[in-house]
Amino acid sequence: MRPSRTLTTAAAAALVLVLAACGSGGGSGDDSGGNSGDSGGDSGPTAGKVGVILPDTASSTRWETADRPLLERAFEEADVDHDVQNAGGDAQRMATIAEQMIADGVTVLAIVSLDSASGALIERRAAQQGVQTVDYDRLTLGGSAEYYVSFDNVRVGTLQGEGLARCLDDRVGNDESVNIAFLDGSPDDHNATLFSSGAHAVLDEMEGYTSVAEQAVPAWDPRQAAAIFEQMYTRADGDIQGVLAANDGLADSVISILGRDGQAGEVPVTGQDATVDGLQHILAGDQCMTVYKPIDQEVDALAELAVALIDGDEPETTDTVRDPEGDRRVPSVLLDPIPIYRDDVKRVIDDGFQSAADVCIRDLEDICAELGIE
């Protein structure tokens, strides 16, 4: 085998009712994804079932284009019965999917929480039913997951901070202060907090940088990001020389606003996720860098951990991560992110994470050829 949004009080109360009402099981009827593998009978050599609930399609394209197919392939190769679904950005829908998975007999449930309040309720319900839980990619604050699988998210922010400093290097000095803006991820995504802390740990300690604006983007929504950055840019009278954008989706929004003022490519912008758009912006010179997280490694780590739990073994971990709300340390598998600049785009293509056919289009064909991307 392969290696092998914080809820309002009313919404949280409604979610409790959903979790309680769905406890008796029943037909799924959910259209967010289907079962992979048999739901009954012989499930193969590995006796157990894994459920994975992805969060949405808006915060990143990765969930459906990368995580879902890779997860399904990993569990198929491990000969493990599995069910991978997507909550579509709806916390109550995620709760309903979780209850159905529990009723269908999952022994391990991995979730990417939309927010910690709803995620913690799901994990509590799963524990009551004897289902082991894993936080995948995002730590559920105040939750009860036994394990956490993700990339080192503070390191992601560190790479972004170092990247922005590198791209602004020739502008710092001569007693001039460079104005930078921070466009952070969703305020109810703990990863966004970690990204920001890593970036600030770099830039706040360096001379020559002044933070003139910082704001989180609810639900990582690119449309809101564009509106937020436009306000930042206007209030600063366009006097912003660099932007720490938490991912490629937010970076795309920033670049669109800068483009209206003829500043796309003049103001370095960071990103994350090595998306097609992000790589294209880097090749075109409009984006400084992105952070590449080989999702196949994260998927394989989750598959290995889930199989170990099903087999009754203690999974191998690399670290522990502190849950500040639960006042506990969660055994974790943390993977290393990779900075990607213009000369590194080829690596992402060679890894098969993105394809040259998708990235190297129109005016970028010659640039790709120059960089040996094919």
Regions found by a protein language model. Give the residues of each.
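Sec-dependent bacterial lipoprotein signal peptides
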Residues: 1-20
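A residue-level marker of the well-folded mature domains of exported/periplasmic proteins
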Residues: 2-4, 22-374
